[in-house]
């Protein structure tokens, strides 16, 4: 069987594209890769891309010079987790506090990892997790 290399893109659907973009760039420090009226793309860790789509803007086929992208969308609070270094967990907690982002939950995992949870401006659950969460991370 051919193998999959990684999850390349993760998509969240947002009501206010500018507000969400500011949160992911200014609060989480993600580097913008692409912007248009329908979506924003951010680099995550040099190998992954976070896509923010304006909710409802992708319900029709998207025609590109090289082909088409089928319709997609999402609703309700979704979840995304970002990996962080264990020794940066306290710094992340301080950064979120300074940015007035409330931490909703904390988890210590059986494998030794730690997670903190908070919401983005659209109510999506964002997790920052250290190694020791999964057998592969």
Task: Give the ranges of each region predicted by the language model.
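Core segments of cupin and vicinal oxygen chelate
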Residues: 13-59
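Vicinal oxygen chelate
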Residues: 3, 93-137
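Short amphipathic alpha-helices within nucleic acid-binding modules
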Residues: 23, 88-95
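Short hydrophobic/aromatic beta-strand micro-patches
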Residues: 13, 81-85, 119
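N-terminal beta-strand motif that seeds the catalytic metal site of vicinal oxygen chelate
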Residues: 1-19, 78-80, 132-137
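Helix-adjacent hinge/juxtasegments
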Residues: 55, 60-78, 83
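Helix N-cap motif at beta-to-alpha junctions
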Residues: 16-17, 85-89
């Amino acid at each position: 069987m051919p193998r999959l290399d990684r999850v390349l893109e993760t998509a969240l659907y947002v009501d206010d594209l500018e507000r969400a973009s500011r949160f992911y760039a200014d609060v989480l420090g993600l580097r913008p890769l692409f912007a248009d009226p329908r979506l924003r793309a951010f680099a995550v860790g040099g190998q992954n891309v976070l896509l923010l789509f304006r909710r409802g803007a992708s319900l029709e086929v998207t025609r590109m010079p090289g082909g088409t992208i089928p319709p997609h969308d999402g609703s309700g609070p979704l979840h995304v987790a970002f990996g962080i270094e264990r020794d940066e967990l306290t710094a992340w907690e301080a950064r979120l506090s300074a940015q007035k982002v409330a931490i909703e939950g904390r988890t210590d995992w059986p494998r030794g990892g730690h997670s903190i949870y908070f919401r983005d401006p659209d109510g999506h659950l964002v997790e920052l997790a250290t190694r020791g969460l999964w057998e592969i991370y």
